[in-house]
UniProtKB/Swiss-Prot annotation:
One Gene Ontology term of the molecular function aspect: metal ion binding
PANTHER family for this protein: IRON-SULFUR CLUSTER REPAIR PROTEIN YTFE
Primary gene name: dnrN
Function: Di-iron-containing protein involved in the repair of iron-sulfur clusters damaged by oxidative and nitrosative stress conditions. Required to repair damage caused by nitric oxide to FNR and NsrR transcription factors.
Mutant phenotype after disruption: Mutant is more sensitive to damage induced by a sudden exposure to nitric oxide and is more sensitive to hydrogen peroxide.
Keyword terms of this UniProt record: Cytoplasm, Iron, Metal-binding, Stress response
Alphabetical list of Pfam families matching this protein: Hemerythrin (PF01814)
Protein family (similarity comment): Belongs to the RIC family.
A GO CC term attached to the entry: cytoplasm
Protein name as it appears in the record: Iron-sulfur cluster repair protein DnrN
Length: 157
């Protein structure tokens, strides 16, 4: 896991900016590649590829894009304005959605055998699982930074 100690005392605005650049922008790029790649692998290897993966990744993308938009348009501006505990309700909603993201990651791990492509898998299949693991690791770090550091600090302010 990433070292987040720098964010434990950083100004809220700096933490929000980091989340936007390091996670929101990165997730958008990850899913731009992941979803079409999963659809390609599902089509080419329909007889052996777990059919649910492509749909799950598309659903994860759609849910995460909506989630990030809510943070960017509502929650993060509130945090940057210093509303403190006034952000408790939107933070609660975001944390609930984070639990849904955690469940989706768990299902993806299950479907992919913890991101291990089968022996002899083609390059696209292998790349898909490597990218999916990277996205899941990033999303876990992203959720930790928000829930356990940023949101906790905002609610304590």
């Amino acid at each position: 896991m990433t070292d987040f100690s720098v964010w434990e005392a950083a100004p809220f605005g700096a933490t929000v900016d980091h989340i936007l650049q390091r996670y929101h922008n990165v997730h958008r790029a990850q899913f731009e590649e992941l979803v079409p790649l999963a659809q390609k692998v599902a089509q080419v290897h329909a007889d052996t590829f777990p059919a649910e993966i492509a749909g799950l990744l598309a659903d994860m993308r759609d849910e995460l894009l909506m989630h990030m938009m809510k943070e960017e348009r509502m929650l993060f501006p509130m945090i940057n304005q210093g509303v403190g505990r006034g952000a408790a309700m939107p933070i609660s909603v975001m944390m609930h959605e984070h639990e849904e993201h955690d469940r989706a990651i768990a299902r993806l791990k299950e479907l992919t055998g913890n991101f291990h492509a089968p022996e002899g898998a083609c390059g696209s299949w292998t790349r898909l699982y490597a990218l999916a693991k990277e996205m899941a690791d990033d999303l876990n770090d992203h959720i930790h930074l928000e829930n356990d550091i940023l949101f906790a600090r905002v609610l304590d302010s």
